[in-house]
Amino acid sequence: MSRQDENSALLANNENNKPSYTGNENGVYDNFKLSKSQLSDLHNPKSIRSFVRLFGYESNSLFKYLKTDKNAGISLPEISNYRKTNRYKNYGDNSLPERIPKSFLQLVWAAFNDKTMQLLTVAAVVSFVLGLYELWMQPPQYDPEGNKIKQVDWIEGVAIMIAVFVVVLVSAANDYQKELQFAKLNKKKENRKIIVIRNDQEILISIHHVLVGDVISLQTGDVVPADCVMISGKCEADESSITGESNTIQKFPVDNSLRDFKKFNSIDSHNHSKPLDIGDVNEDGNKIADCMLISGSRILSGLGRGVITSVGINSVYGQTMTSLNAEPESTPLQLHLSQLADNISVYGCVSAIILFLVLFTRYLFYIIPEDGRFHDLDPAQKGSKFMNIFITSITVIVVAVPEGLPLAVTLALAFATTRMTKDGNLVRVLRSCETMGSATAVCSDKTGTLTENVMTVVRGFPGNSKFDDSKSLPVSEQRKLNSKKVFEENCSSSLRNDLLANIVLNSTAFENRDYKKNDKNTNGSKNMSKNLSFLDKCKSRLSFFKKGNREDDEDQLFKNVNKGRQEPFIGSKTETALLSLARLSLGLQPGELQYLRDQPMEKFNIEKVVQTIPFESSRKWAGLVVKYKEGKNKKPFYRFFIKGAAEIVSKNCSYKRNSDDTLEEINEDNKKETDDEIKNLASDALRAISVAHKDFCECDSWPPEQLRDKDSPNIAALDLLFNSQKGLILDGLLGIQDPLRAGVRESVQQCQRAGVTVRMVTGDNILTAKAIARNCAILSTDISSEAYSAMEGTEFRKLTKNERIRILPNLRVLARSSPEDKRLLVETLKGMGDVVAVTGDGTNDAPALKLADVGFSMGISGTEVAREASDIILMTDDFSAIVNAIKWGRCVSVSIKKFIQFQLIVNITAVILTFVSSVASSDETSVLTAVQLLWINLIMDTLAALALATDKPDPNIMDRKPRGRSTSLISVSTWKMILSQATLQLIVTFILHFYGPELFFKKHEDEITSHQQQQLNAMTFNTFVWLQFFTMLVSRKLDEGDGISNWRGRISAANLNFFQDLGRNYYFLTIMAIIGSCQVLIMFFGGAPFSIARQTKSMWITAVLCGMLSLIMGVLVRICPDEVAVKVFPAAFVQRFKYVFGLEFLRKNHTGKHDDEEALLEESDSPESTAFY
């Protein structure tokens, strides 16, 4: 079919076959004539051709069929009850079905599928069956004293099965908790707000509540919440995350697309096999304008409105997400510890295999020869002996495999992220929580992070007048210089009108419909400002923390907040400050803002807005071109309004307007006066804004030929418009105050004590930036005297790489910086070896946020693009939250190191003790039975992980220097403690096991009864557990004397007091109580299942006192400097030890290099300690 034939067919289809059904067929409810699939076809793929099939060449048909209005949006009687409407019943809302988590039983089954657990279960069942056979089918046996021996072997089988069940249950419970934690995190990070027009009002709603037919307002930095068709404006979108297309795509209104489609596919055009569609290129190289905004794409520049056509699972983003099965991510630390656990497991498996081979070989020698010890036993007893060997070997594997390592990091991260959320950090990427512990540099924005982001115009120079609303002046001066008084008495009505037009029309902020003015605060802009921070926090937290479908709770909370107070305007804080000034002093009435924008003719004599130029950080200004009905010569003319950074806008001004409307050409004298005013504002830490305009009286249409944009001929090129010679008139200067956040100075000083360098990166001019940096201690007296302590972004980006590296140690303030300057700063710092955290709020900050080791975006003032690019969202935009993130990052690292220290002590001791005692035993039994070992395994894996991985940050955690990138899991001081405690425990348990008969019964080993032997074995087990009990107490504090080489200097309460701040971690205290109580119960009531014989008083005292030796050993090890250990174990010895016993010879890669990324021993920061590693 030719193009004209198909074009005619499209027209015929549209005229004759438009959707006309009204019933419930195809899932369409009454009053809606389009199905979900029909609307979904518009975007998947993007097709204006499909649009024409449905709606024809008139965009108004789109609004007709979706029952919405281009300007007023959809009409809902009660916005909160949208689920009762046919619109919702027909198309749904924009929420996606939640991923169904694994049930608890599924997790139990997954935990039981562990091969070791299954082997142990099979062995337990066999042991149980053999025990029953001996009990019921074999004659009774008697000991040398003639006492009947109780047949209790079957009890051990049952006890092992119960122990396996408990281990599996605990493992499943931990996994279930982890599933819930990640589900909760995903809910928090996937929710956000969008501006929609409903009932002819702009409101903020959750993206999950967006409906088909909603008209949404999009601006730079937004992420498109659902598939929509653009109906007004112009913007650039990044669709790479959805389509993979790396180039940005310009978006135009649907009318442009329909015009191009009709033109390119007209009968007069060249023939093609099929009509051209969005993305196709005609013979002239032109494309059809793209009006289709895909859900999940990002608005990089511009602004506009779109009407929603597909939501939820019917949108492109929804279809993509439902096809994925997102599993919780593994962080680098989790992967590292999993590999470490695998390496340790190798040693356990090797030990178990050797143990089995030794015991089995001896077992064969016992049963094959006629004089062998087991030769005369019946088959069931021989089988039972073999099963004991097998169970002991399998249990060694169970104990040796440190499954608690991955669990510990999961618990530590879950605990830390939960607490960080309470402290104002929403962790989007788990690895960032770990990385913050090593941070050495923080590059922070100023606005909202170091300051409150509660902006108020406190000083200004309208024309040649001056006002001052700050409270620093005497009362009499305040009355004279009050802004309202100055505007009314000193400024002409036309100047006031032009300033009001510039502020009202040249803004994206809008009026808060829920705002209720407090009569008691009619002139209290300061009172208004005080509460902004609290409301922003409430909004931000609700935005990210809605649970399930508790919209009613959210609405109720907002209603309660509204009873107190809210800000009158929503949007950019600079723009809301200017609008507040307009309401306070320029006559803007409540509820009038949107009316003036819709009907500018009424007050301003403006026919229409012809070009909008939204603010971008790279330009530092926003602009607007309007058409006036008539000017002084009674003819229509165009006016360009501009407001932005004072020094940038004012330097392009040719004239200065006086308060009486006379113009004064700018020369060197009055230019210096203006520059001085700007400097004075900046020196007082005020943001200086210039407000200006330029008239175009000689052009009949917009834009003038000389200003026309080559790519978009219907608008003026921004560089030509702003830099056009002559004519820009400066209407006034305004100084905006943004108070420093409470406690920010202390937070910065905390970072400095912690060895973290804080740099301020801001778009403000250098004088303002330096003033604020001094106030918050970033720029101290010592640093400010140094060269290059503060510089502007334009100067910084001109430097060579080597010059940047040379000045960065002194640089603390980067002013008038662009997002590219911030990215360059981060790149240079990382190249110098720093671990860099950076904050960002704008769309253009995304590259820097991605490049940084940890990117912080603003939860209140940040764009959606910035949030998507970040690792952590600062829900309150507060710098103190970054300090908390550093604390918790360090706490995670410390908690993991504590657990590794404890785990390896128990691991080494338990495996060696079991191995040696089994081999040395004449009847091939270990001093620790399988059930006892499973109890020990429960202590060292699950309970210890809960106790040690859930600790809060130490009070002095910010007094230590950061480790940087080369932080190792196991330091010299940790290895000292591991080897010393393991040696102590082995000596104590070996003495009790091998010399117990002589110590307690004054008899040789061969002379004691089986009951006495069982008592000694039980005492060894009891001692072993109490050793771990007190070792856990030692492990809760890492070596605080690290780095102190003086023996006397290491004797301090901070280093040696293991009970310091013990009460702050209730988890630890509870678990210690559980371990101690359970051990006492086992020793009194464990009986046959735990192979326990009643202990004497002396045995109890011995066990507990021997356990306390761990505390004494801990003190001695802490006093010993690390340098002593390094000298004992030289580097060459350690490298050979790692190569052989670390199994590095098995892990060589093909190039011959060692793949030691996950090796147990890592290279340390200090040259002295490398020998020990």
Swiss-Prot record:
A Gene Ontology term for the protein's cellular component: fungal-type vacuole membrane
Chain intervals with Low complexity compositional bias: 7-17
InterPro entries for this protein: ATPase_P-typ_cation-transptr_C, ATPase_P-typ_cation-transptr_N, ATPase_P-typ_cyto_dom_N, ATPase_P-typ_P_site, ATPase_P-typ_TM_dom_sf, ATPase_P-typ_transduc_dom_A_sf, HAD-like_sf, HAD_sf
Catalyzed reaction equations: Ca(2+)(in) + ATP + H2O = Ca(2+)(out) + ADP + phosphate + H(+)
Keyword tRNA-binding among UniProt keywords: no
Protein name: Calcium-transporting ATPase 2
Extra remark beyond the main annotation: Present with 98 molecules/cell in log phase SD medium.
Family: Belongs to the cation transport ATPase (P-type) (TC 3.A.3) family.
Top EC category: translocase
Catalytic residues, chain numbering: 445 (4-aspartylphosphate intermediate)
Chain segments annotated as transmembrane: 115-139, 153-173, 350-368, 389-409, 900-922, 930-950, 977-998, 1011-1029, 1066-1086, 1100-1120
Residues in compartment: Cytoplasmic: 1-114, 174-349, 410-899, 951-976, 1030-1065, 1121-1173
Record localization: Vacuole membrane
Organism lineage: Eukaryota, Fungi, Dikarya, Ascomycota, Saccharomycotina
Molecular function GO labels: ATP binding; ATP hydrolysis activity; metal ion binding; P-type calcium transporter activity
Protein's membrane topology: Multi-pass membrane protein
Listed GO biological process terms: calcium ion transport; intracellular calcium ion homeostasis; transmembrane transport
Pfam family, one: Cation_ATPase_C
Primary location group: membrane
Ranges of the Vacuolar topological domain: 140-152, 369-388, 923-929, 999-1010, 1087-1099
Chain sites annotated for binding Mg(2+): 445, 447, 841
Residues involved in Ca(2+) 1 binding: 398, 403, 937, 941
Organism whose genome encodes this protein: Saccharomyces cerevisiae (strain ATCC 204508 / S288c)
